[in-house]
Regions:
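Conserved catalytic-loop position in the HRD/HxD motif
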Residues: 208-210
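Glycine-rich ATP phosphate-binding loop
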Residues: 69-75
Length: 387
């Protein structure tokens, strides 16, 4: 159910990525002139007669100026009205059907629909997207494996956004990467590490990391490939408190401390304050017990998510609306990784990253979490965890 709560929006959006027919080229030219003040043929040295890609919210042209190629994204007409109409309809249906659905989630589906609706309205404001792109680029300026297209402010407005052109390979399938002499595993690692940085270091993350928004670039190495992010319309934040609690939850899963894990869920808002946490210890143990196998790296997020979804039908878990986009981003990113490598295990990459953060972060909260990793309940050093 975790995935299904965001799944309908994801399926609709992802099915439209790069698949919708282009809207009338004359309309696109009209929008460019209205937004930028001059016709496209006066603004750019070259401007094509048709877009190179067309998706749910707009279409992209490959233009040229000063011997450099640019990506000019033009918004579909009437999007504000169409999104408002669809969100109102979905909100009504969600509110009406919520009591009839066999979902014991403790929070109205309408709140989650509202969260996605807000994100969609933000996504069609290209001025906000431009600000997001600049902020995201600044966060990754010290990371040599992450590339963000340069914003061209003079050719950007509320319905048109222009950036430098990214010449890369979309992370759609393994064979496509291999045909271009690119190593899939290296891009999975860069993708996962950058996602972890966004959630646990920056507190600001790309909420739409589907294959069409991520490009594999030449360079890098067999360990970490060079990766470009595009499309910064759907972004979100996570508080420091939530970040720390999520790290604690991961540690409690690894240590098989299910009562403490239930407390983490309660603090994050997935369980009400009135909930008797002791009753959840055995169900959590059934779902998560043995999920790590012989090694931490064997943890299979998809299998656990599927089991947890069934658990949520029987116990009073809920999905706080502020986690809707976080879940969407994590599910999208794992789906992308599994597309490139069906045997992908997220903790093989995530656990060393989290361990490094625990060892290098000097905050008091992180130190407390580190002690939980190093010592068991009896105060003995957990050699296998430390190693």
């Amino acid at each position: 159910m975790i995935a299904s709560l965001v799944g309908s929006e994801m399926c609709i959006r992802d099915s439209l990525q790069d698949n919708l027919p282009a809207f009338d080229h004359k309309i696109a030219l009209k929008i460019i002139e209205e937004e930028l003040g001059s016709p496209a043929n006066e603004l750019f040295e070259e401007f094509p007669d048709s877009p190179i890609a067309s998706a749910s919210l707009g279409q992209v042209y490959k233009a040229k100026i000063n011997n450099s190629y640019l990506a000019v994204k033009v918004q579909r007409p009437n999007l504000y009205f169409l999104i408002r109409r669809d969100v109102v309809i979905l909100r009504f249906l969600g509110t009406f059907l919520s009591p009839l659905l066999p979902l014991n989630i403790g929070v109205g589906i309408g709140e989650i629909i509202d969260e996605f609706g807000k994100a969609l309205f933000d996504e069609i404001d290209y001025q906000k997207e431009a600000e997001n792109a600049l902020r995201f680029a600044n966060l990754f300026k010290e990371n040599p494996n992450i590339f963000i297209p340069k914003l061209e402010k003079q050719f950007s407005s509320k319905r048109v956004i222009t950036t430098s052109w990214i010449d890369g390979v979309k992370l759609r399938d393994r064979s496509l990467l291999e045909e271009n002499n690119l190593i899939p595993a290296s891009f999975i690692k860069t993708c996962v590490i950058s996602g972890l940085q966004q959630l646990f270091e920056f507190g600001y993350f790309h909420a739409d990391p589907h294959p069409g928004n991520m490009f594999a670039l030449k360079g890098g190495n067999a360990d970490c490939g060079n990766l470009a992010y595009v499309d910064f319309g759907m972004m979100d934040t996570i508080t420091n408190s939530d970040r720390l609690t999520l790290i604690k939850a991961i540690v409690h899963i690894i240590n098989e401390e299910y009562y403490l894990l239930a407390e983490d869920f309660q603090k994050l808002g997935f369980l009400t304050k009135e909930q008797d946490l002791q009753k959840l210890v055995e169900p959590l143990k059934e779902v998560l017990g043995g999920s790590l196998g012989a090694e931490v790296g064997n943890f299979n997020l998809k299998n656990v998510t599927d089991k947890f979804s069934k658990l949520m039908y029987s116990y009073p878990f809920r999905v706080p609306s502020r986690f809707a986009l976080i879940i969407r981003a994590v599910v999208s990113q794992e789906g992308l990784a599994l597309r490139l490598d069906p045997e992908f295990k997220i903790l093989k990459i995530a656990y060393p990253y989290i361990a490094k953060k625990l060892l290098t972060d000097n905050s008091e909260e992180i130190l407390e979490i580190l002690l939980e990793v190093v010592f068991d309940k009896k105060g003995q050093i957990q050699i296998e965890k430390v190693e």
